[in-house]
Swiss-Prot record:
GO annotation, biological process: deoxyribonucleoside triphosphate catabolic process; nucleotide metabolic process
Name under which the protein is recorded: Inosine triphosphate pyrophosphatase
Catalytic reactions of this protein: ITP + H2O = IMP + diphosphate + H(+); dITP + H2O = dIMP + diphosphate + H(+); XTP + H2O = XMP + diphosphate + H(+)
Organism: Ajellomyces capsulatus (strain G186AR / H82 / ATCC MYA-2454 / RMSCC 2432)
Cofactor or coenzyme needed: Mg(2+); Mn(2+)
Length: 183
């Protein structure tokens, strides 16, 4: 079985990736700090992956998550980590207070590079939901405020979330590509 270096310091992301890809490829974790540029989701993902492949001198997989508020024309997008850190769950809800439209889209973008100098390939998944006041255990980012069909991600068990999440959808595409192209 081939091995891939998943570049993350987030143990929750690592567990999800290993659970979904584990039967296709061995996922090793490399917790290195890769600087992120500002730009579109795709630009950020590709540049992060290029730098990761150079750093590990081998195959690299990186992930970037965005949360797009439709009422705010896609903001905060790829900057959700910083918005969440600064505002918290309540503050993010307050951003949408003036708007009727509480719809949001979770976007997960994985980028894979076979090594230094190789152009990264993008695999993206999206899940539509709506912003709600925080419910459930706050173990993983904005899960308590992202509602999908009546439950927040934080209220779902891991297996249920892994079947419908933006991350799962992106990983399903990556998994298929790995099986067909990178055996």
């Amino acid at each position: 079985m081939k091995t891939i270096n998943f570049i993350t310091g987030n143990k929750n992301k690592l567990a999800e990736v290993q659970a979904i890809l584990g039967d296709t490829i061995e996922v090793q974790n490399r917790a290195i700090d890769v600087p992120e540029i500002q730009g579109s989701i795709e630009e950020i993902a590709k540049e992060k992956c290029r730098k990761a492949a150079e750093t590990v001198q081998g195959p690299a997989l990186t992930e970037d998550t965005a949360l797009e508020f439709n009422a705010l024309k896609g903001l905060p997008g790829p900057y959700i980590k910083w918005f969440l850190e600064a505002l918290g769950h309540d503050g993010l809800n307050k951003l949408l207070d003036p708007y009727e439209d509480k719809s949001i889209v979770a976007v997960c973008t994985f980028a894979f590079s076979s090594g230094p100098g190789a152009e990264p390939i993008i695999f993206q998944g999206k899940t539509e939901g709506r912003m709600v006041p925080a419910r459930g255990l706050a173990k993983f980012g904005w899960d308590p405020i992202f509602e999908y069909e009546g439950n927040t991600f934080a209220e779902m068990d891991k297996d249920e979330k892994n079947l419908i999440s933006h991350r799962y959808k992106a990983l399903a595409k990556l998994k298929q590509w790995l099986a067909e192209t990178y055996p």
